[in-house]
């Protein structure tokens, strides 16, 4: 017998990937992510889902059948950046979406090409790190708050990107050490940042470090705040241009070293900004 249950989702724009969260007793809090249709290379209506319940199923397959038909009630299920309530049932090897009620379209992103590609990059980044049978609640919460930040004019998109990347690394257990020297655990004094070493290195330990980046207090404090802050408070500050440039240089090196995939959305984004 097919199991039917209610979900909440946030869609992206590639019709391949959904992230969802299901809570106990049939009600749920979830995010459903779908990447750009033109770049997906999969059948229309097909997706992967992250489901949250007592078993933490992780990534699962899902379908929105007939979503591209004119006047289809499931059109919201495949529109980019939509958040809402989904009803679906579980089949033998996949889940099928039966109905959808969209509560937030994030329409600002659809009207802003650069903002949209930032969003696609975050979704592709998250999909790279999330895995089957994992509890991905924190990553999905980060994605939702990041999409909200992208619709705000008060924080630069580049800062949103660097905050997202650093926090995503932390959620995945790969965040850099920004509170003490990675070698001797010294907590005070002048430090440099080494991506290869995985964080701060004090001047006494940095003699053989070839990739050390000198850090000012403002940049270091910014990184510390991002790592320890709750997700809800991540996008509540701005920084100077100098701090953003330094933070960007650090995260560029860190991503190059620890992210093995080259994201298509990022390639396009870099041609636009």
Model-derived segments and spans:
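Compact, basic/aliphatic-enriched, mixed alpha/beta core segments that act as assembly/interaction modules
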Residues: 1-25
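A short hydrophobic/aromatic micro-motif that marks alpha-helical segments and, especially, helix-coil
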Residues: 17, 28-31, 231
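Enrichment for repetitive, rod-forming helical segments
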Residues: 9, 29, 168-169
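Generic secondary-structure boundary signal with a strong preference for alpha-helix termini
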Residues: 14, 25-26, 185, 210
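Non-catalytic alpha-helical scaffolds and adjoining flexible linkers that form interface surfaces
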Residues: 43-45, 53-273
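Short amphipathic alpha-helical interaction elements located at domain edges
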Residues: 22-51
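Short, leucine/isoleucine-rich alpha-helical interaction segments at C-terminal helix-coil junctions
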Residues: 12-15, 28, 258, 272
